[in-house]
Structure formats: C-alpha cells, structure tokens
Amino acid sequence: MDHYDSQQTNDYMQPEEDWDRDLLLDPAWEKQQRKTFTAWCNSHLRKAGTQIENIEEDFRDGLKLMLLLEVISGERLAKPERGKMRVHKISNVNKALDFIASKGVKLVSIGAEEIVDGNVKMTLGMIWTIILRFAIQDISVEETSAKEGLLLWCQRKTAPYKNVNIQNFHISWKDGLGFCALIHRHRPELIDYGKLRKDDPLTNLNTAFDVAERYLDIPKMLDAEDIVGTARPDEKAIMTYVSSFYHAFSGAQKAETAANRICKVLAVNQENEQLMEDYEKLASDLLEWIRRTIPWLENRVPENTMQAMQQKLEDFRDYRRLHKPPKVQEKCQLEINFNTLQTKLRLSNRPAFMPSEGRMVSDINNAWGCLEQAEKGYEEWLLNEIRRLERLDHLAEKFRQKASIHEAWTDGKEAMLRQKDYETATLSEIKALLKKHEAFESDLAAHQDRVEQIAAIAQELNELDYYDSPSVNARCQKICDQWDNLGALTQKRREALERTEKLLETIDQLYLEYAKRAAPFNNWMEGAMEDLQDTFIVHTIEEIQGLTTAHEQFKATLPDADKERLAILGIHNEVSKIVQTYHVNMAGTNPYTTITPQEINGKWDHVRQLVPRRDQALTEEHSRQQHNERLRKQFGAQANVIGPWIQTKMEEIGRISIEMHGTLEDQLSHLRQYEKSIVNYKPKIDQLEGDHQLIQEALIFDNKHTNYTMEHIRVGWEQLLTTIARTINEVENQILTRDAKGISQEQMNEFRASFNHFDRDHSGTLGPEEFKACLISLGYDIGNDPQGEAEFARIMSIVDPNRLGVVTFQAFIDFMSRETADTDTADQVMASFKILAGDKNYITGDELRRELPPDQAEYCIARMAPYAGPDSVPGALDYMSFSTALYGESDL
C-alpha cells in the first residue's frame, strides 16, 4: 500500500513503490499534481478568505492545513498553536493528521516531521488522501463507490456523445471531449458541442476549463498543454478535477429535485382547480339544457294532420336518439368527475369541494327527474294523438286506394267500348273480340261491389266530419256517373260484335277454300322456278341428256297447271262480290294464307318466261360436253403411250445398272445413249402438258379414257431423269474407284455379282443382314459371337456413316477396295515426317517450310500441336498426333 493510503481506499490506491517510481520517472505527473492539488485546496480555502501559493511551503506550519480540513469537513478542530517554532508546527500538523485518522483513514508512513520539512512527495500524498476521503470516497453509483463509482458516473453522462469513450482517468480525457461532454450534458447552453473536433484537443480542453471556471465555480486545476504534452496524464490529477465536476453537478441535481417537488405539488393543485371549474361549467350547461327542454316536452297542442304529428314524433325520436344520450353521458361524467375530485382532494390533504348553490349532484338529479317525467307524459300524449289521427287517415286512405284502383281500372274503358275495331276485323278477330267483351262484362259485374264500397266510405267520412270531405264527395260522384255510362256502352258494343260475326263467317269459308288450293299450287310454282333456275353442273354427255329429258316432261304438265290457276282466282273473285254487296270493310287479308292472286299471276308469268331460257341453257351445255369429250380422248391417247414408255425406260436403266455386260466404259456409253434418247422425248411431254392445260381450263376433272394423270406423268418423267443421271454418276464413280485403287475389271465384275446376288429386291442397296451375308460369302469371318458383332458394327460405321440402314454399291466398292488395295496409313505418314525431321521426335516450322510447298507447310504448322517431350526445343511441333488425326485416329 501507498504510505499515505488507507484501508477504506485500498481499491483505488497504488502500491507505495509504484507511487515513488511514478514520481521519479515522470516529473510531469508531479507538476500536474502540484497544480491540481493547489487549485483544489484553494477552491475550499477561499471560502475562509485565504489561499496557498506553494503547496509544500504553505502547509508546513499546519495552520492552513487545519483550516482546509475545517472548511471541507464543516467541523471545528483543536485550537492550533500560534508559535513559530518547529515544535509548534509539528503539533499543528499532528492535530490535522489526527483529525484525518479520526475519519477512519489509516495513515501509513506520513509523519508531521516530513510535512514540516516541506517533503513534496509526502505533502502531495497527504493532500491526495484528503481528496480521496472528502471528495471521492462518498461518491456512490449503483453499489459502486469511489473510483469505480466516479468512472461509472462519467460513462453514464457521456454515453450519448460521439467520439467520447471514458474507460479510465488518464488517456480517455486527453482530447478534452470528455470534459466538454460532462458540461454539455448538464448545462448544454454553455458549450456548442457540435462544433468541437476530436483532432483539436487544446481547444477542447481550454474550452472546458474556461467554462467550468467561469460558470461552474470550478477552478482551473490543469493546463491543457500539460495534458496534451503528456503521453499519459496523471490519474490522480484527472480524478481530482473530475470529482469537482461531479460535486458541482450533484448540487444542481438537488436543486432540480426540489424544483420538481414544488412543480408536482402545484400541478396537483392546478389539476384540482381545473376539475372544479370543469364541474361547475358542465353542471351549468346541463341544467340550462334541462330548463330549455322541459317546456318543449310539456307542449300538448294537437295537430290537424297525421304528417304534422309524425314530424313531432320524429323530433321526439331525434331527441331520444341524438340529443339525450350525450346529456346522459355528461350527467354520468359529471358524477364521476365529482367523485374523482373529492377522492383526489382527500388523498392530497385538501378540503372537500363544495359546488355553487343549485349545482350540487342532488340538484342535478332532481332536475333530471323532472325532465324524465315530462318526457314520459309527452310520449304518451304523442302516441294517443297519433293513434287517433291514424284511424281517421286510415279510412281516408282506404277511400283513396279504392277510388284510385277503380279509376285505374276504368281508365281507357270508355274509349275501348266506343272504338269500331270490329269493322276491319277478321272472323277470328271478331270471335276474339266477343270473348274479350264477355270477359269485360264479367269484370264489370265484379267491380259493382267496389263502387258500392267507395260510396259507403265517402258517406262515413262525411258523418265523421273529415277535413277534406268536399274533395271526397266530388270524387265519389264522378265515379258513380262514369259507372252508369260504362253500362250503356257495354250493351251497345255487344250488339255490333254479334252482327259482324255472322257476316264474316261466310267470307271465312271462302277464304279457307282459297287457301287450301292456293298453297299447293304456289309450292308447285316455286319448285318449278327453282328447278328452271337451278345451275346445273355436269361432266358427261349422258348427264346433260338426262336433264333435257326431265325438262321436256315438265313442259307437258303446264296446261293442267293453268286450269288450276284459273279455278283459284275464281274463288277470290266470289269473295270480292260479297264484300261489295254488303259493304264489308275488309281491312285485313286472308287469315289462312298470305298468297295473293297477284302473287299467283306473277309467279305463273315468271314460270312461262323461264321455260325457253332453260331450253337454251341445256342446248349450250350439250355442245360444251361434246367438246370436253374430244379433249379427254386426245389426252388419253397420248398419256397411254407416254406412261408405259417411261416405265419401260426405268426398268431398262435398272437392268443396265446391275448387269455386267462389257466394261464400265461400255456401260457408261450405253447409259449416255439412253440419256440422249430420253432427252429427245421431251417434246412429247410438252405436247401432253399443253393438252392438260386445255383440260384444266375446261374444268374437266376425270377421264375414263386413261388411268394416267398429268401428275403421274410428271413424277415419272422427273424420276426417269433423276435415275439416269444418278446411274451415270454411279458408273463414273465406279470407274474413278477402280482406277484409283487399281481394281481390275474382273474384280469389279466379281463385286457386282456378289452385290446383285444379295440384292434380292433389286433396290440397288443392301440391308444390314444382306450386307453381312455378302461379306461372309466373300470370306469375311463374321460370326454371331460378341467379337463378330463388334467387327460387323465397325464395318457398318464405315459403309453407312450416316446410319441410314442401307449400303449402296458405291459404299460397297469403296470398302472392298480399301480392304484389298495398298493404301496410305498413319504410320507411313509419321515415318515420312520423321525423315524430314532428321530422325527427331518433333519437327520445326523452318524444316516444314524448307521441305514442303508453302501452302501445305503453313497448313501443317497451323494444325500441329506444340511438342511436349523431354527433348523439346522452342518451336517444336508434334507431327505424330497430327499424323494420327489425319486418319481419324485422334482429333486435330
């Protein structure tokens, strides 16, 4: 432990040897402690009207030391010695040290003699002990004390500030932002924290120290330059300075707490006063509303009409629904506020609230009772009055409804009975009108009761002195007069309808006879017109001859048809006589048919006109069919020659391609002669095309004189040209293969014989099984075992690379020539490259350009891969992989 430490402060004191070493190693700390401790002492001594200048000199006599302890403790010490001798000074210092010890601080190695002798280290240690005991030890924050408590307080206060991170009492304060943050947290008006910069510690420190000295009564205990110029400021100096801030702000906190307590008491009192004012106003408003409402509810003046009484009832319902509920809520809230106010006053030891006279809760309840009593009587009166008017209005409404129904029923009835629609009606319409009139008479009888009821209700309303009786009487009289008139018109109309019915029944029988005979005759004429105008489509002479015969048969029926026409017109003329004789107004037409005599005559004339037109059309079509028949015969004669000729040539070419007569050159010469003869036949094809064009223009679609169509001829001709060209090409390729591979004519004939032998369908190709049998016949050992199947699959991939499933004769020749001839191999090419390379495993570009033509040398250089062997040189190329790639044994 430090020689001036105590047991109570062992958690924040350094060991003595560390204290000594610190003072010796860092004189800057001693300077900081001198200045800080001196300023701290003077901040208390000035209260006694004195101060110190030199801390180790001014405390030597013990007088100012005792005075300092009295100021900071508030207690009186023993009377000091006033002598100037050393013994007097030691006595005074001991009195001070004894007082410190009496406060529970156990001093170690601090003696009065060292203080009297001006020992700086001991003097600073003693002052630090005093600071710890009287300025820091009592600091407590959340169960932490002394140093930790002070540090926690600093961290709490500076937490919201950027660039401030208080972790200790030395380097955390070097930039000055910590001091500024403490001041701004408690007195934000003193410092504009937003303008401070972390990289300007001198300004920050001087700002904090100057503001603290000027406004917070905290003396300047350190120089900003000393803190900034020290790698680690003295912890005790910083703690002393910070503790001054703590005590300065803790006093302000106490004042704030006292002010808050006063504000709280005043707020409670103001709230109670506001509640009293609210109660008085609410009570006054509610009583005023009750006084205004009661006279309205006591008004019992009745209204003459139901509408007016219903409006009063609606107003009363609005009062119940809209106006009263808020007042009920106000009354309830008034009682709640009164009880709440009395409770708050009682809890806060205030006297009970006494409302103004007439505004007590009981006064309001009495007024409310009067309101509800008036309300109940008003509602009963309204309902009784409404029921009374309702009975009278019901009777009047019943009259109006019955009168309206009767008037609606009679509306248009007089006009209907006066109309003379029967004069232009048909018999069926007359019968319908009679049925309708009978129904009306039944309806008229049924309405007799309603008319009597209307008169009875009107009489009752007169007896009850209904206010609108004059209008009721006038309406009733009008209904009775109209009713008598309807009866007279009804009888008159019945007589007219029955007279007209008898006259029209005779005419109806004639109309029916006319309709029965006119309809089939009209259908016959329409069918005849359709047949005569029908657009016929024929393709043979036989068809046109059949149409001509049918037309002649139709013309033979025309005289009988004309007789039927005249008979039908006679019936219509008889009807016309009856109409003229009895002056019947025939506004309508024949109800049984829409066919008029004019229509019959018009259609008959049309039929007579269409007959010669049909004769001419049939004659022209007969001539056209004769011409078409000549075209058919001409085309058929040529097609029956050309078709077989093409088929014969196809067979001959196929036979030449598989026969083995003569050499390949002889076969090629023979085929070229065939090709020439085929080309010379082209004019006959063109002539046939011309005949086919004429047939198409004549719209001829079939030809019984030949089985060949132009499409068949075209396809056959194109196949013939393609076949001769392909066959010539195959023979030319066989000649090239023979010459390139050195195959003799005998070998070629043998290959052809083998191929033809197994080409049993003469298709010119071999299937896989046919090809396999052919290879076996030529001596290839291809069995059905896995090895044989693999070998055959390899051969098929050579002869059928596109996997078409067939082997042509050319592919067969190529395969057989490779199998029998001496061909180049990859090994031979590699051996040649090795010679050019001077027996090396690689070759260079210069060697290739020297030995090969330029284009072939560049081709090899572009495609050869770089050589990667151990004997490689720059620019070496791999001719071995290139050689195998040429024969498909690897990739280029």
From Swiss-Prot:
N-acetylmethionine: residues bearing it: M1
Domain Calponin-homology (CH): 31-135, 144-250
Domain EF-hand: 746-781, 787-822
Gene Ontology biological process terms, A to Z: actin cytoskeleton organization; actin filament bundle assembly; actin filament network formation; actin filament organization; focal adhesion assembly; muscle cell development; platelet formation; platelet morphogenesis
Region spans: Interaction with DDN: 274-733
Subcellular location: Cytoplasm, Cytoskeleton; Cytoplasm, Myofibril, Sarcomere, Z line; Cell membrane; Cell junction
Modified residues (Phosphoserine): S6, S471, S677, S890
Keyword annotations from UniProtKB, A to Z: Acetylation, Actin-binding, Calcium, Cell junction, Cell membrane, Cell projection, Cytoplasm, Cytoskeleton, Membrane, Metal-binding, Phosphoprotein, Repeat
Region (Actin-binding) residue spans: 1-247
Subunit note: Homodimer; antiparallel. Interacts with MYOZ2, TTID and LPP. Interacts with DDN. Interacts with PSD. Interacts with MICALL2. Interacts with DNM2 and CTTN. Interacts with PDLIM1. Interacts with PDLIM2. Interacts with PDLIM4 (via PDZ domain). Interacts with IGSF8.
Protein name: Alpha-actinin-1
Protein source organism: Rattus norvegicus
